[in-house]
Amino acid sequence: MSIDEILEAVEGLTVLELNELVEKAEEKFGVSAAAPVAVAGGAPAAGGAAAEEKSEFDVILASAGEAKMKVIKAVKDLTGLGLKDAKALVDEAPKAIKEGASKEEAEELKAKLEEVGATIELK
């Protein structure tokens, strides 16, 4: 199988299938797909600049709450997933709804999902 054929196969996967692929690759090859984290060099000097504000957020569905069907519909509408994939994502909570979202997008997703009863965390 050529690299182009592999890429074509990956393009056809759903978000949940891609997540499963990443998890299996991590297990098989003993690696992590997590972004590298910078290690702090120590405490900032007195009078130093304020810590830089975080610019990317992961929107995590912690719980669907009482109105699970409304949350599934909202996840489906907000992510573009099919009904089956949206239901699977909600059933697997806590689970990332969106990774690497801007602050505005993350806050908007959080507000819309909390409006239908979901418990959301921003990381």
From Swiss-Prot:
- Which molecular-function annotations from GO does this UniProt entry contain? mRNA binding; structural constituent of ribosome
Cellular component terms, GO, for this chain's entry?
Answer: cytosolic large ribosomal subunit
Give the range the annotation lists for the signal sequence.
none
Task: Read off the InterPro entries from this record.
Answer: Ribosomal_bL12 (IPR000206), Ribosomal_bL12_C (IPR013823), Ribosomal_bL12_C/ClpS-like (IPR014719), Ribosomal_bL12_oligo (IPR008932), Ribosomal_bL12_oligo_N_sf (IPR036235)
Any idea which UniProt keywords this protein has?
Ribonucleoprotein, Ribosomal protein
The biological processes this protein is annotated with in GO are: translation
Q: What are the annotated disulfide bridges?
A: none
Q: Family, per the entry?
A: Belongs to the bacterial ribosomal protein bL12 family.
Role of this protein: Forms part of the ribosomal stalk which helps the ribosome interact with GTP-bound translation factors. Is thus essential for accurate translation.
User: What name does UniProt use for this protein?
Assistant: Large ribosomal subunit protein bL12
Q: Which organism is it from?
A: Finegoldia magna (strain ATCC 29328 / DSM 20472 / WAL 2508) (Peptostreptococcus magnus)
